[in-house]
């Protein structure tokens, strides 16, 4: 394992147009540690972190900033020098480096970052407990049929979590986020997007299976 300023890098993947990393923020377990690492980050990230009331939220926000900072080193940049702007649907970008695209995600004690030279979206989720409302919100009819054909609850939970992270990453890569209606498109076994009710931009995907969690990255082209 590799450590950087209080986060533990647990997975990294280099793809054609981006790099993806997942880290644990468990070491950021005191207010003093979080305050110390915030001194390394941008005013925007510090303000965002301090808006969280609880230690867990602050650790995730600071950890996401640290992971982005770590990955920006590849380009000779530091997060503390970054200024951000926000797109129409709320997706942030690096104001002075439009050639670089990034996206962040967090779940429980994990943070994920995708950074590269194509529009990217990343999502990380711990394996979820299935609820019908989530299934209906997330899945197309054919995906629900595939889910119902599975024998074990464990297989169903993993399949659903994988599909959810793939769809979240895709929605974030397109910049539309939660405005994207997830049942309006399906993701096949070949990891290709299939538009069900409207034109949907093409993308490629990668899944990262972690212990009790799943991460996914989408690269729009």
What are these regions (language model features)?
Residues 1-221:
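Core catalytic alpha/beta fold that binds nucleotide/phospho-ligands
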């Amino acid at each position: 394992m590799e450590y950087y300023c209080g986060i533990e890098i647990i997975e990294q993947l280099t793809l054609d147009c981006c790099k993806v990393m997942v880290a644990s923020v468990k070491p950021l377990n005191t207010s003093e540690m979080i305050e110390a690492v915030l001194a390394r980050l941008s005013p925007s990230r510090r303000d965002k972190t301090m808006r969280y009331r609880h230690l867990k939220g602050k650790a995730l926000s600071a950890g996401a900033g640290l992971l982005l900072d770590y990955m920006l080193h590849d380009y000779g940049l530091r997060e503390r020098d970054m200024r951000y702007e926000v797109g129409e649907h709320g997706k942030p970008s690096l104001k002075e480096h439009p050639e670089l695209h990034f996206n962040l995600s967090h779940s429980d004690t994990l943070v994920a970052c995708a950074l590269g030279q194509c529009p990217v979206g990343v999502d990380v989720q711990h394996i979820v407990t299935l609820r019908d409302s989530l299934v209906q919100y997330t899945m197309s009819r054919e995906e629900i049929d595939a889910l119902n054909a599975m024998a074990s609850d464990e297989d169903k939970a993993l399949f659903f979590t994988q599909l959810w992270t793939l769809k979240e990453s895709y929605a974030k890569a397109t910049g539309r986020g939660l405005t994207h209606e997830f049942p309006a498109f399906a993701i096949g076994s070949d990891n290709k997007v299939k538009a069900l009710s409207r034109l949907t931009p093409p993308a490629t995907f990668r899944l990262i299976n972690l212990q009790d969690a799943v991460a996914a990255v989408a690269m729009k082209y």
